[in-house]
A protein has these predicted regions:
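Interaction-mediating elements
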Residues: 1-276, 285, 320
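Amphipathic hydrophobic-ligand
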Residues: 67-72, 152-156, 348-352, 392-394, ...
Length: 649
């Protein structure tokens, strides 16, 4: 970051990249030589001017972090190895300068009543190191704080610092200067300064089918029409006869209303919700000052919002903004066709898949997708009783960019990216040794909050495996993999599931991070209650059946917590704790095999293959070729030190 010259990369301890680069003929400019130069790396030759610049960079950085008495030096060793130079940089930080006194100078006196009450959240404290990086962060924090309260034109350049170090003892008297808004320059070239303006929203125009190419035409606006809906002007072209998205849907995703005080959080929320619909390719939220309201001195009573005391009422200048939201839609419809062929020593196979997607099927950014698949296999084995295998399936999904609920959810301000998804799938397999049908139906909701959490709830989650026929003698009894053998059992699972994920990796990208996952599912309770009321077990059986299948009744929960602690720029200590428990009851004696816990694999103990670690619930036979260790409970912990290996060679 600060050193201007770094050694060449090495491969297995050798200067491989320099060697490749030097194989290129400098007098020939053909593709082969260009390829060598691109793959290789030019040798890094010692440049003392860059070495001096590196020392200056180190000194500037230490000054920037408050170590003004620091020193940076270097030594060059050219004798240890022939034609090689070794540079050693040394830094001495010494005692840092600290903040002795902090004061404020408000050139815009109205901002004093807003900023001073919020100093409890200030990043600047007396006694702390005079770190200019923290000073910049405080400027950004105040700017964001004011932009949340109507100060649209306020920037970090409106805040300056004056530092006085003449008092000695490595102490700094710091003054923050909050300036007025620079409105322009007069005829003599002097700046025109005014108090910062609080802006309200005037008109809100949304273009749900914006075409940037057509918008540059001189007569573009003549062909536009507008529908007004609850403070929102939905602008569309007359040739389309109506907007491509219903105004009521657009109103739900735009949390900006006329006469609202400008708030940058609502602007970000508007952009995120538009893009999360999945229908628009890009979007722009543009604000323009209304000249008629800005030009005149329009003084109104403004009550500071947020953390200010209730009596902080003052007179400030007010302006208005026109909001234009330009939404460029993606391709509405699409399809795919896939053909796949396969061959082994046992069979020939051919599979075809046709899929269709509509991203706006009901003019509300609803996404509908459906796919059909057909497969055929021909067995090469002449002794097989049946040499043909057929498989076909249908999968459908319908997703709404909102909650489908019998009550309104507009008041839930913390909910972001709400989704409702309906899914249906069925797959029929007719093979020489078995015949089965796999089907699933699900109704689920998903959403996230304003920070790091995401949620998923499936109140309806049904999965059915119906084994119509299986040849035990010639097929099932010969399977040595117990996990594979149990996959050919019929099962009926009807329940609900919930999952929660907390992940602050996006906020602390490259730094410390925490990842928490919680999953819970419960099956069979509602169905079991209905069966007890209206039915009874079949003769000779102590359990209930639905469509001739025993339904599962159980609950299952698991929790995983991971923590990453950076020990340097590329080295990290990562710890993980996992716990899970499941229990069958009522109509079941065991949890479905694919819901049991196991250890090993990429998401568990990576040193072991999946389902091969741990005793599980039932010990495996000693002669088992494919051990399958499954259980009703799992506790797991691991600790990893992650560091790059490539750079070590």
């Amino acid at each position: 970051k600060f050193i201007r010259q770094n050694p060449n990369k090495r491969f297995l301890g050798l200067n491989f990249y320099v060697w490749v680069y030097e194989q290129a003929d400098p007098e020939k400019d053909n593709w082969w030589n260009r390829f060598k130069r691109r793959i290789g790396e030019a040798p890094v030759l010692l440049d003392m001017s860059l070495t001096e610049q590196s020392v200056r960079n180190l000194k500037v950085y230490m000054d920037y972090r408050g170590f003004f008495s620091s020193q940076a030096t270097y030594e060059v060793d050219t004798t240890s190895r022939k034609k090689r130079a070794f540079i050693t940089y040394r830094t001495v930080q010494r005692e840092p300068y600290r903040i002795n006194r902090l004061s404020y100078d408000f050139r815009d006196r109205f901002l004093e009543q807003i900023i001073l009450p919020d100093t409890v959240h200030s990043l600047l404290r007396t006694g702390e190191v005079f770190d200019m990086e923290v000073l910049d962060q405080e400027r950004q924090r105040i700017t964001t704080y004011l932009k949340q309260r109507g100060y649209y034109n306020f920037t970090v350049n409106n805040i300056e610092y004056e530092a006085d170090t003449l008092g000695g003892n490595h102490l700094v008297d710091l003054k923050m200067i909050v300036k007025q808004h620079l409105a322009g320059y007069n005829e003599q070239g002097y700046p025109i300064l005014r108090n910062n303006t609080v802006y309200r929203i005037d008109q809100i125009n949304i273009f749900p089918n914006y075409d940037p190419t057509a918008a540059i035409a001189p007569d573009y606006r003549k062909g536009l029409d507008t529908i007004y809906y609850r403070g929102l002007n939905v602008v569309y072209h007359k040739d389309n006869k109506r907007p491509n998205i219903r105004p009521s849907v657009l109103r739900q995703i735009v949390p900006i209303y006329p006469n609202y005080v400008y708030n940058i959080n609502r602007v970000d929320q508007t952009y995120n919700q538009i893009m999360s619909m999945g229908y628009f390719k890009s979007a722009n939220v543009i604000f323009n000052e209304q000249a008629d309201s800005v030009a005149k001195d329009n003084y109104v009573t403004f009550v500071g919002e947020g953390k200010e005391p209730a009596d902080s009422v003052h007179q400030t200048r007010e302006g208005y903004l026109q909001c234009d939201i330009q939404c460029i839609p993606a391709l509405k419809q699409g399809y795919k066709i896939e053909l796949e062929g396969s061959t082994t020593s046992s069979f020939y196979g051919l599979r075809a898949t046709v899929g269709y997607q509509n991203r706006n099927i009901f003019r509300g950014a609803e996404s509908f997708d459906v796919s059909f698949s057909v497969g055929y296999e021909y067995m090469k084995t002449p002794s097989a009783r049946k040499r043909n295998a057929i498989e076909f399936g249908v999968n459908m999904g319908l997703q709404f960019p909102r909650f489908l609920l019998p009550f309104r959810t507009q008041r839930w301000q913390s909910i972001q990216m709400p989704r409702t998804r309906l899914e249906f799938g069925i797959n029929f397999q007719d093979r020489p040794y078995y015949r089965r049908t796999l089907s699933s139906v699900a109704w689920g909701y998903s959403w996230s909050d304003l920070k790091y959490s995401s949620y998923s709830l499936r109140p309806i989650d049904i999965n059915v495996i119906d084994m119509g026929y299986v040849n035990r003698k010639d097929f099932l009894d010969h399977l040595q993999n117990e996990y594979l053998k149990r996959s050919y059992e019929s099962q009926f699972i009807s329940g609900l599931s919930f999952s929660y994920v907390y992940n602050n990796q996006r906020k602390h990208l490259g730094g410390n991070a925490t990842l928490l996952r919680f999953n819970y599912e419960m099956a069979g309770n509602l169905l079991d209650g209905l069966m007890h009321l209206f039915s009874r077990p079949a003769a000779g059986k102590d359990y209930y059946e639905v469509f001739g299948l025993q339904y599962s009744q159980y609950f299952r929960a698991d929790l995983s917590v991971s923590r990453k602690i950076m020990l340097g720029e590329v080295t990290a200590l990562v710890g993980r704790l996992y716990g899970g428990y499941g229990m069958a009851y009522g109509n079941s004696t065991s949890i479905p095999f694919d819901r049991l816990f196991y250890a090993g694999g990429a998401n568990s103990m990576r040193g072991w293959a999946p389902r091969m670690l741990g005793p599980g619930a039932v010990p495996e036979p000693e002669d088992a070729v494919f051990p399958t260790q499954l259980g009703d409970m799992k506790l797991e912990a691991n600790l990893e030190l992650r560091f790059p290996i490539w750079g070590m060679f």
